[in-house]
């Protein structure tokens, strides 16, 4: 294991030509202190939890005393926000502290969120609030536990300093990790400002660092774009399969590596509601749960437009044409796994569609249903009450269950083996908004024990965790269908 002082920085992004961002001196909270740390993320940097308890950890990660090799840097980008192009955004309250090479040679961005104003703050204070910091910290680990590509939180630095939003809130900073923070909107910025040489420089940088098999190859830009299309299709299929709504799928929130990026007004489904809107600012439902696959394609088309100085229109169209088949294949693979099916059959799509229609009509809890379905007894006449009782009118479930039973029999499914498979892919725990709010309320009162407890539970969401059972329950009345603000 390493010490802080042994971290190896290789700041490739900060070494790009002028115009990719701005070097910034962080303005951390003077009373910043470590209030939660993620041991699993520390391990990626070869650091121990004990190393994080050193005062130097807070000073370095909070930006007060950067480590040798750190070069705090705010990245510039643009983006389509709710379908409207905004020509200049950038890291308004975030900083790339530096890029660390781990012992295996993998590279990790260390990103500080809430470290004060930057040239891209657009009049804002550059701060983050504890509420949104906890939500992002926990959801990053929840998504990682679910096997979904994501940024991850290294730790939360708390403060007593007030931050002024719609109300006065408690300030905090998040130390975030990811292989890269390059976005679709990064390419858009250089394209629409007609800096075509920077579009090529950025593409070559991303290819060299993250798609090295394409470096120097003929046709590399078209192949790169096709790979981004594939990764994005896979990511959104994974979101849909676990019932995750991002809430603000602007192109500046889309990762070029297919990571879940920028957790804001997200939400996991409680009842299965295809049109679920988790962002209360999304009055037209542009980013509703069932619109995410369509928006993924729209965003990729925006990226393709930004790459047209590197690829032809025919190459862009060919890459985009792979999106829907890739999405469909990934989504159905996930749904077959959730249903415990081993074989691929033509009728599977209809089986899933029929189930979804019945779940939506009956307002069945999405996560709890699939977890319980693992215990479905497939023998004719077997007791199916644990799942059946989730439907107010059980006859609707019975009709689907007959088809499901026949489908299981057709591939010779064995209940015990199927149960084991389904338990590995259907989580017991997701970060429901009401659970996050409970952790936030306690933390705002100075108690971070639930934040730490949930971090552990969500990192292993398929296990039973008997002492966390209340957080697998259906939400209380006050916690149903919560919509969340973009304010952070």
UniProtKB/Swiss-Prot annotation:
Coiled coil: none annotated. Keywords: ATP-binding, Magnesium, Manganese, Metal-binding, Nucleotide-binding, Nucleotidyltransferase, Transferase. Its cofactor is Mg(2+); Mn(2+). Its EC number is 2.7.7.-, 2.7.7.108. Mg(2+) binds at residues 253, 262. The keyword Metal-binding applies. It catalyses: L-seryl-[protein] + ATP = 3-O-(5'-adenylyl)-L-seryl-[protein] + diphosphate; L-threonyl-[protein] + ATP = 3-O-(5'-adenylyl)-L-threonyl-[protein] + diphosphate; L-tyrosyl-[protein] + ATP = O-(5'-adenylyl)-L-tyrosyl-[protein] + diphosphate; L-histidyl-[protein] + UTP = N(tele)-(5'-uridylyl)-L-histidyl-[protein] + diphosphate. Signal peptide: none annotated. The keyword Transferase applies. The active site is at residue 252. Pfam families: SelO. ATP binds at residues 90, 92-93, 113, 125-126, 176, 183, 262. GO terms for molecular function: AMPylase activity; ATP binding; magnesium ion binding. Nucleotidyltransferase involved in the post-translational modification of proteins. It can catalyze the addition of adenosine monophosphate (AMP) or uridine monophosphate (UMP) to a protein, resulting in modifications known as AMPylation and UMPylation. PANTHER family: PROTEIN ADENYLYLTRANSFERASE SELO, MITOCHONDRIAL. Belongs to the SELO family. This is Protein nucleotidyltransferase YdiU. The gene is ydiU.
């Amino acid at each position: 294991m390493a010490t802080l002082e042994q971290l190896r920085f290789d700041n490739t992004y900060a070494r790009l030509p002028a115009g990719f961002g701005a070097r910034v001196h962080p303005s951390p909270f003077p009373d910043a202190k470590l209030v939660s740390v993620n041991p699993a993320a520390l391990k990626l940097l070869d650091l121990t939890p004990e190393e994080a308890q050193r005062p130097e950890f807070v000073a370095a990660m909070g930006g007060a005393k950067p480590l040798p090799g750190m070069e705090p840097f705010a990245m510039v980008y643009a983006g389509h926000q709710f379908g409207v192009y905004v020509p200049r955004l950038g890291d308004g309250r975030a900083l790339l502290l530096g890029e660390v090479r781990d012992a295996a040679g993998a590279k990790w961005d260390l990103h500080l969120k809430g470290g004060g104003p930057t040239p891209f703050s657009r009049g804002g204070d550059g701060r983050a609030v504890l509420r949104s910091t906890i939500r992002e910290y926990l959801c990053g680990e929840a998504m990682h536990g679910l096997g979904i590509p994501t940024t991850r939180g290294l730790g939360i630095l708390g403060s007593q300093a007030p931050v002024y939003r719609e109300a006065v809130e408690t300030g905090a900073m998040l130390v975030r990790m990811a292989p890269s923070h390059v976005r679709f909107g990064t390419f858009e910025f250089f394209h629409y400002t007609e800096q075509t040489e920077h579009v090529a420089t950025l593409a070559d940088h991303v290819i060299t660092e993250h798609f090295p098999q394409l470096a120097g190859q003929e046709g590399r830009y078209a192949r790169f774009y096709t790979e981004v299309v594939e990764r994005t299709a896979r990511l959104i299929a994974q979101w849909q399969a676990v019932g995750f709504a991002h809430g603000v799928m602007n192109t500046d929130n889309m990762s070029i590596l297919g990571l879940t990026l920028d957790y804001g007004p997200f939400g996991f489904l409680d009842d299965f509601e295809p049109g679920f809107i988790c962002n209360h600012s999304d009055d037209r439902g542009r980013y509703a749960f069932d619109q995410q696959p369509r928006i993924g394609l729209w965003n990729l088309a925006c990226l393709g437009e930004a790459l047209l100085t590197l690829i032809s229109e025919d190459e862009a169209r060919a890459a985009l044409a792979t999106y829907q088949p890739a999405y469909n294949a990934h989504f159905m693979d996930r749904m077959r796994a959730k249903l415990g099916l081993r074989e691929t059959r033509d009728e599977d799509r209809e089986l899933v569609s029929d189930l979804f229609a019945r779940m939506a009509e009956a307002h069945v809890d999405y996560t709890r249903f699939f977890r319980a379905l693992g215990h479905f007894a497939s023998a004719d006449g077997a007791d199916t009450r644990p799942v059946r009782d989730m439907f107010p009118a059980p006859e609707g479930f019975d009709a689907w269950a007959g088809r499901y039973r026949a489908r299981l029999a057709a591939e010779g499914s064995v209940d015990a083996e199927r149960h084991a498979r389904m338990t590995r892919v259907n989580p017991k725990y997701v970060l429901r908004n009401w659970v996050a709010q409970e952790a936030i309320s306690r933390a705002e009162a100075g108690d971070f024990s639930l934040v730490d407890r949930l971090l552990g539970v969500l990192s292993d969401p398929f296990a039973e965790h008997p002492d966390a059972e209340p957080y697998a329950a259906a939400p209380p009345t006050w916690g149903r269908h919560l919509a969340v603000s973009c304010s952070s």
